[in-house]
Amino acid sequence: MAGHSKWANIQHRKGKQDKKRAVLFARLSKEITVASKMGGPDPAMNPRLRLAITNAKGVSVPKDNIQRAIDKGQSSGGADYADIRYEGVGPGGVGIIVEASTDNKNRAATDIRTAFSKNGGTLGTTGSVSFNFDQLGEIEYPVSAGSADEVMEAAIMAGAQDVESNEDGHWIYTAREDFAAVSTALADTFGSKVEPTSAKIIWKPKVTTPIAGDAADQLMKMLDVLDELDDVQSVYDNSEISEDEMARLSGG
């Protein structure tokens, strides 16, 4: 779950990196399986599968793992999955959106509600938090794609809305309805020279909520718990945490 724009520091979690990587691989493999089951095994004909494979390759999921996940989606008797969004408020009044893909809605709802209630949060109704977020396309490219100016020019020509660049990479934002077209245009521009690290629809906060101290500690704990739930695919929040506070939370 990479993210380096100002609002996305919430995606840098405490914890053992090996464990986080294993959780990430499992989550990406699951998304490939679900996409394969819902839309077929051919990424050329299945946009969701194509994006899932792009994101898996972006964090070096082995090709064999990707193929096994595709095949699993095509096997008979597999579970049926539903995509569900949960919204709530965490410690310090931070808004949180949780996207889940589950074969058991009751289990998912119970686990997510418990993660909120045991960590100073309250699970709300659909729409109770998301009005404070914009749903956008986010396409991440490595620094090797070019300079900030070069990527900005390519993104504008492709129809993107905004670009954020730093020493870690480039994040290109699009309107949700333009996501596929911009992704294709950028792929044509960069060709085989460089591939995106990730490409997905995200929830980006319109406004952020400053948080520090005990509330920040509790929020990080809640987000860690949510991240590790099997049914959870993505977690977004609108916390604003200073660099010094992030260093403290990370043990730095």
UniProtKB/Swiss-Prot annotation:
Keywords: Cytoplasm, DNA-binding, Transcription, Transcription regulation. The keyword DNA-binding applies. It is found in: Cytoplasm. Coiled coil: none annotated. Its main location: cytoplasm. Gene3D superfamilies: 1.10.10.200, 3.30.70.980. One of its GO terms (cellular component) is cytosol. GO terms for molecular function: DNA binding. Pfam families: TACO1_YebC_N, Transcrip_reg. GO terms for biological process: regulation of DNA-templated transcription. The keyword Cytoplasm applies. HAMAP family: Transcrip_reg_TACO1 (MF_00693). Belongs to the TACO1 family. This is Probable transcriptional regulatory protein HNE_0161. It comes from Hyphomonas neptunium (strain ATCC 15444).
